[in-house]
């Protein structure tokens, strides 16, 4: 079996390649150029070539900058522009790392691709990694279900500290083993607002309203805020903390309330991405949802229906087979999520990820 390994220049991808090589697989490496900063790429490519020389494997450089700009970066900007909170990693994994990269691997005669993500695959489902502090199953939950048989995650059963220890045992990988962690969003060096300032006038004064619609303060531009933020705006005569509850991009207004006002008992998602048959998901006794990467899982119930532009007929009691239905395009489906306990700070634009009781990802959807 021939596997193309995504090499970033970091320890996780290097160890992934080493593990697969030691296991007897025929492997090649590939570095993906996703955004600008030539000096950034030059340093990483040098590291990737060093890993390739150490493992005695062929390495490729795949320029996906145009695809990344169109599929990830521009939607990132647009999502903030309309007052929502984007999840660029979820978009990148679907369209770039497990889309274009997989296409490239096939063009090179490879059977599968491998990455340094901390996750597992079990029964054709993505599953949480052993190292829950590094688990990346959340970010992988938006990939197309059909690509899972073509993916390998060598680090799924390893702890991060053991990955570094393993790398340090080889002189050729010792330097990489001591490298710092990469940014959560690869193209954001400091904060997201610094990126937005390059394209938008982010400092535009606006008003703050309470939940009753009354003007209670002022702010310096709605793009500076996400749901749940409690600083950066002024509330006249406030004696207790206020939190952003809602953002009105068209009016350049934010709505604030107490922390309790952030609690939601239900919400809707768009682009429902199912990894199991719809009827199988609907019949599950236990389903848990994460509303953002670092949030705890919350028990929930899912009600699935067609998007408004198709039909609003509920599918809750229908016996629909996902594989043999007309719903292979996740754009067709939306879901209503009913929480067993309230969730704090549900943000439109973020990814909601659904797990079964064994920590396998069964579906995902973007919060409406």
UniProtKB/Swiss-Prot annotation:
ATP binds at residues 6-13, 32, 116. It catalyses: S-sulfanyl-L-cysteinyl-[protein] + uridine(34) in tRNA + AH2 + ATP = 2-thiouridine(34) in tRNA + L-cysteinyl-[protein] + A + AMP + diphosphate + H(+). One of its GO terms (biological process) is tRNA wobble position uridine thiolation. Gene3D superfamilies: Adenine nucleotide alpha hydrolases-like domains, HUPs, Translation factors. GO terms for molecular function: ATP binding; tRNA binding; tRNA-uridine 2-sulfurtransferase activity. Keywords: ATP-binding, Cytoplasm, Disulfide bond, Nucleotide-binding, RNA-binding, Transferase, tRNA processing, tRNA-binding. Coiled coil: none annotated. Residues 134-136, 292-293 are annotated as: Interaction with tRNA. It is an enzyme of class 2 (transferase). InterPro entries: MnmA-like, MnmA-like_C, MnmA-like_central, MnmA-like_central_sf, Rossmann-like_a/b/a_fold. It is found in: Cytoplasm. The record marks 117, 350 as: Interaction with tRNA. It comes from the Bacteria. Its EC number is 2.8.1.13. Disulfide bonds join 92-186. GO terms for cellular component: cytoplasm. HAMAP family: tRNA_thiouridyl_MnmA. Belongs to the MnmA/TRMU family. Catalyzes the 2-thiolation of uridine at the wobble position (U34) of tRNA, leading to the formation of s(2)U34. This is tRNA-specific 2-thiouridylase MnmA. It comes from Campylobacter hominis (strain ATCC BAA-381 / DSM 21671 / CCUG 45161 / LMG 19568 / NCTC 13146 / CH001A). The gene is mnmA.
């Amino acid at each position: 079996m021939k596997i193309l390994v995504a090499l970033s220049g970091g320890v996780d991808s290097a160890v992934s390649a080493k593990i697969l090589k030691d296991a007897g697989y025929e492997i090649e490496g590939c570095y993906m150029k996703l955004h600008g900063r030539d000096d950034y790429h030059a340093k990483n490519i040098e590291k990737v070539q060093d890993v390739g020389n150490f493992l005695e494997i062929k390495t490729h450089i795949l320029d996906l900058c145009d695809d990344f700009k169109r599929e990830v970066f521009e939607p990132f900007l647009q999502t903030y522009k309309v007052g929502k909170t984007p999840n660029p990693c979820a978009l990148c994994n679907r369209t770039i790392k497990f889309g274009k990269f997989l296409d490239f691997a096939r063009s090179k005669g490879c059977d599968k691709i491998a990455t340094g993500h901390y996750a597992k695959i079990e029964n054709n489902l993505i599953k949480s990694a052993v190292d829950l502090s590094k688990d990346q199953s959340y970010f992988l939950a938006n990939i197309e279900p059909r690509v899972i048989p073509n993916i390998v995650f060598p680090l799924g059963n390893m702890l991060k500290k053991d990955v570094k220890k393993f790398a340090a045992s080889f002189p050729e990988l010792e330097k990489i083993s001591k490298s710092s962690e990469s940014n959560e969003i690869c193209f954001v060096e400091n904060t997201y607002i610094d990126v937005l300032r390059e394209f938008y006038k982010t400092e535009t004064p606006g008003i703050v309203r309470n939940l009753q619609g009354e003007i209670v303060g002022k702010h310096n531009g709605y793009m500076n805020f996400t749901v749940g933020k409690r600083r950066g705006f002024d509330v006249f005569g406030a004696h207790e903390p206020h939190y952003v509850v809602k953002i009105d991009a068209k009016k350049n207004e934010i709505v604030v309330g107490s922390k309790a006002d952030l609690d939601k008992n239900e919400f809707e998602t768009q682009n429902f991405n199912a990894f199991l048959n719809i009827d199988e998901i609907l019949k599950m006794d236990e389903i848990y949802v994460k509303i953002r990467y670092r949030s705890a899982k919350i028990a929930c119930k899912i009600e699935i229906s067609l998007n408004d532009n198709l039909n609003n007929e509920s599918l809750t009691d229908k016996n629909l087979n996902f594989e043999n239905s007309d719903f292979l395009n996740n754009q067709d489906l939306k879901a209503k999520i009913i929480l067993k306990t309230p969730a704090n700070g549900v943000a439109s634009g973020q990814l909601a990820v659904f797990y079964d009781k064994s920590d396998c990802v069964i579906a995902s959807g973007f919060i409406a």
